[in-house]
Amino acid sequence: MEKIDGKDQSSQGDEEKEPPKSYPYSVETPYGFHLDLDFLKYVDDIEKGHTIKRIPIHRRAKQAKFSTLPRNFSLPNSGDRTYAVPPQQNWSPVVPRKISLGTQEPSQPLPLGDLPQASVQGSELNYHRKALLAKDARQAEAGSLEDVGSGRPQLLRASSMPATLLQNQVPEEPSLTSGPSTLLALPLLQDEGSVCDGAFDPAEGLMGFQASAQSVDRELGELEPAIPEQVWEGAEPEEGDLKASSHLSQPGPSSAVQSVPMDLEEVEIEHHMREAELVLTPGSATPSPPPLPSPILENDLSLDEIELSISEIPPPPPIEVDVRSIGIRVTEESLGLLETDTSSISSLKNQVLALEDKLSGRTEELARVRAALEQQEEETKAREQRIQELECTVAHLEEKLSQERASEAPDRTDATVNTDPLQELTPRESHDKNIGVNLLNTPDPECRAPRAEKNGFPWVQNNHKQSYPSPEEPVLPPQLSLPRGPEQILASSLCSCLSMELRIEEEGSEQEGGQEEGAGGLSRAAGESSWSTRESAPVIREEATSELPGAERPGRPASSPQDATIGQYVKKIQELLHEQWNCLEHGYPELASAIKQPASKLSSIQNQLLSSLNLLLSAYSAQAPEPEPKETPAPPPSTPPPPPPPPPEISPSTSLKSIMKKKDYGFRAGGNGTKKNLQFVGVNGGYETTSSEETSGEDSSPEDLSDSETEKKQDCSESREDRDLHPSCEAGQGVPEGTRNSGHTSDRGEEVSHLRAERYKPSEEFLNACQTLSQHLPETGDTTKQLLRQSLNTISQEWFRVSSRKLSSPEAVAAYLLEVQPHSPYLLKLLVNLADRSGNTALHYSVSHSNFAIVKLLLDTGVCNVDHQNKAGYTAVMITPLASAETKEDMAVVWKLLREGNVNIQATQGGQTALMLGVSHDREDMVQALLSCQADVNLQDNDGSSALMLACHQGNADLVRLLLAHPACNSSLTDKAGRTALSLVLNSPAHVEIAELLRAHSEPGRSLGPKELQKN
């Protein structure tokens, strides 16, 4: 129990610094504080006696509410008040009114940290209670987090109570002067509801308090306010306490009269104060604690003594919660889902069936794919087995050939090829072409015609049959054949289906019976005949004309053209091996590089196989003797000329290659001295280089030839027309001069030379086109007319066919130049400088194929444009370092070409020069020739590399020494990456010699001469 004195009210009121913002009786200080001056007004009213009349009306009409008390609010000075302390009036220990702070409803306990509240009894202590509550509300809002851990509600501190109150005593009630101070506190307590509204939120448990407060209004006449039981604690006040006002001694007139109205007003104001405390804020989301219990009415207690009982309520006991498990049973029938489930199950079954169908379909597709893969694997295995069989066949043929050469008995076989169409069997429409194959050099008058049937085709065996010449016909040399009679012609026509079958299979891929190199790059004389074949079965089929049963041709041995078919299959094997090698290089470059190593066993096997094939092909192609024209019967005048042999095949280039510097070359200690030859592709101006020390079969690759597919077909038609115009040349084609028998007479040799001249003569179509161009081109200067374009196209096709092939004949080129020269000098210049779709001229092709005899003929005309660039930007001079000049005559042509052309022209593809190309391909002789012809050693390509950098990059010390000997060589040039020639070789220990050469050259005041470079 603590007693509170009213003297400390002024000090407690000074702690509130916030002035009422809308209070009419206040003064603002210079520091922004407001001083409340209402107490002066109340003092005047008390002195004038207007307290009872004006207080309820004035305060009830204003209805002003404040959220907080003014900061500078203070009670009237204690000196202005007089307290009458009636002696011997104390609270009875039996009837103390204990008002609990922070009481709560039993069903809704107050959470930890809520504001503790206390009630003070008496009209003078109501203001002090409100001030403390407002202050504690602000402190609780600021420190709500700090109060969460406390286990009991926060109570009023003893330090917040007035210091002048004595324990176990009640402050004395003022007699007269305490009335104004009590009236001063009542209007402020009406606004206490606003403080509660801002601090607390509505709760469901507080609705009973509002109902109780409303019942107070109905019972004001009886002076018995209805207070809920949840708020009050302790016993009800006794009846004697309600009459405590009679014990007050109040000086002044009519004190007894004023006591009752004051009590009524105070009771009414207390009711409004409690009603304001019970007002709930509807907009808040959090429940507010129950309101503070209203203080005991003044007429219930004595006005002389008011006792404040502060009790501490322990926290409510924890609520026991019973947990029960409730099971709810829901059936499908009650929910009405039975039909829906049935339909959903059926739909799911349908989906499962559809998925099973898809799965089965995919399984079938997978099975088909697997079967296709297995079939492809089987086909691949079959191809590999076929290749192995072909290799075995080649080995068997080589062994057989060696045995035949080693045999002492001479053996000679004549093979005949019938060129008649299959449907024409009359003797007039038949023509025999005889090719004698001399397998041994020793002639023998005996001719044996072995024949056997195997797999439906004639198969040549080692058994021989003796045949005797007819007495009516003279005996001719063994390699020649006699004319046949009608019976033999008919027999050969009947058997010509065999040869026609081969031609049907190889239509479009046969080659002209002219000069063509073998797979090993072996050059043969002009007129040599060869064939190209398609892929065939491992069993070699040989075709020849056969005789009717019982019909004999005396003196005429017959056999299949063994050399032709074997040569075809040998070439096909070479092509397959070359294709296999290309696939290996593209698909497995690491394996291909390993095979290329000289120490590799696979490399040696590959080289041996290719060399064996080359020897076999050259042996068969070199043994085809040329039959004399006079021995071949001329067809009757009415007989149409026989169809010419097909022109040589021009395989389209499989890939476009360029003579740009190598991207994948590595460092080497020095040049390998290998002669490299440029193979011209001729479609987009690209080139490829081959080495004579690499696989010898590369020279006969499909990329060796220069014309495109369109030109190939046109050349075939032109060659057939040319052969039709010169049927007498058929017998002399395709046979080298060196294979003729030494026993031939001189007049026979003259006829052969005459036939050669006739062979190289341009066609009539070519001559007519030249005449047309010579008449119109000088006048018009263009080729817009259809006739002129056709003529130019004809000339272009035949000219490139004659001059631009790898095995073109210089005699043929000379014959064409001689035929064109008389027409017009302009036409000669047009013909020599004629370019194809890729911008390549005959000079480009001739240099790329190392046909320096044709190059010399073109240069001797005096109208050849040496500096003509193709679409890739290369001139004939630029590709000269890639050609192979093996003789002094060839080197003389090279020097002439370099002197007439510009050696410093750069290609448009990469900016390379002829010197860079020579260095990139390790052509030391060509580099020396270019330097002698004023080639600029310091030119740089598009990457900034010079010839010296390329030589250092390849590690060729000889070329580096040769370039540094040039007085204009600059070794400090840098490429676009900022590298010099020295920096390129410093990282490799194998180039110490080159690094020393570069350092010696870069020293100031020292220049290495050729002799010093030779010593180093």
UniProtKB/Swiss-Prot annotation:
Q: List the disulfide bonds.
A: none
The lineage's top-level taxon is Eukaryota
* Keywords, sorted A to Z: ANK repeat, Coiled coil, Cytoplasm, Phosphoprotein, Repeat
| Residue spans of biased composition, Pro residues class | 632-650
Q: Polar residues bias located where?
A: 70-80, 246-258, 460-469
Q: Which coarse location class describes where this protein primarily resides?
A: cytoplasm
What name is this protein filed under? KN motif and ankyrin repeat domain-containing protein 4
Q: What is the lineage of its organism?
A: Eukaryota, Metazoa, Chordata, Craniata, Vertebrata
